[in-house]
Amino acid sequence: MTTLLKDRLAADAIQRIADVLAAIQPNFAHDDFIQQAHTGLQQLELKQRVHHLIATLSLHLSEDFPQAAHVLQQVPAYWPTHNEQGDYGFAAWPLIDYVAVHGLKHPELSLQTLKTLTPLFTAEFAIRPFLHLHFDVTYGYLQAWAKDENPHVRRLASEGCRPRLPWGQRVPSLMTRPDVIIAVLEQLKDDDSDYVRRSVANNLNDISKDYPETVVSLAHQWLAKPTAHRQAIIKHATRGLVKSGHADALAMLGYSQTFNLQNISFTLNKTEISMDETVQLSLSFLLREPQNLVIDYALHLPRANGKKSVKVFKWKTGLLMAGQHELTQNYSFKVITTRRYYVGEHDFEVLVNGQSLGVRTIELI
């Protein structure tokens, strides 16, 4: 059975937080913290649990933030990385975001504390309020962290300044000034950690949604001295542009907006579906010659306000040989933490090199 993300902030995480803080601070009210942390937790969703645990921590850590920060900076020395159920990373989330809630009047100390804590989970969410209220100071830290020896800290330099960070607070200065972000990413484009380079790619993908030509131009600059790592970054960074059929991005990656598919058939195996069921998409076509193709499918799904949003999924990418091709893909209407479904018409659209080849509709009942 799949574990919900919110359940990773439950009894085991609360116990870990209490044990570690009690080891650092012998007068920490271990049992009281556990009892208070559990009170009202069950009905809360993931981010609500984070806020609830921060509020509980505030009852037990010093009201004087420098003293609380001194305790938090010692946490990594006592923090185990794994248990039988998996990693303890999520348990550190409330400890990290505590800094964002209580440390905004102490930006220098808070940023130093976040650097210490980010290897436990990630401080990418906690850093956003500091970028919003203390941009110049925080940006200086990002520039320095991009040169840090710890890959978790270097990743924070990139992930923390993503303009469209999922779940992260929006920072207007990042949305309107891609140049300041790119100055950080320039230091990380040849990083030896895939973990860091993937963050660089995701950051550029964010930027491309508002400044596509800026990202394409930067990609050409980076590929002037091509390496396998840079090529992988650019491929991942331009995935949004490829899905949207951006001609320059497609050409740069070796895909053309002119392609020749014959005898195209795109079908769904049902016209109605219930929640938690699966629909199968089938696509068949004939190629007379080998072609470089990016085949995606888009789901146009209704939201709570009645309007539709679009989510694009990868299907098949690469050089396809001449001949008949039969592709199938299953899509589950199972509710997950990051996606909810509403009854009504859902449209599946097949995209080849960013161009629509057809739409099929299914009714969620």
Across the structure, where does each feature detected by a protein language model lie?
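Short glycine/proline/serine/threonine-rich loop/turn segments at secondary-structure transition edges
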Residues: 335-345
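Surface-facing alpha-helical segments and adjacent helix-coil boundary elements at the starts of domains
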Residues: 1-249, 274-277, 282, 291
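A beta-strand/beta-hairpin structural motif
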Residues: 310-336, 364
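Contiguous beta-strand segments within globular domains
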Residues: 261-267, 271-286
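Beta-strand-rich binding/interaction modules
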Residues: 277-304
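Short beta-strand and strand-turn-strand segments in soluble, beta-rich domains
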Residues: 261-263, 304-316
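Short acidic/polar inter-strand loop motif in beta-rich domains
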Residues: 335-337, 351-360
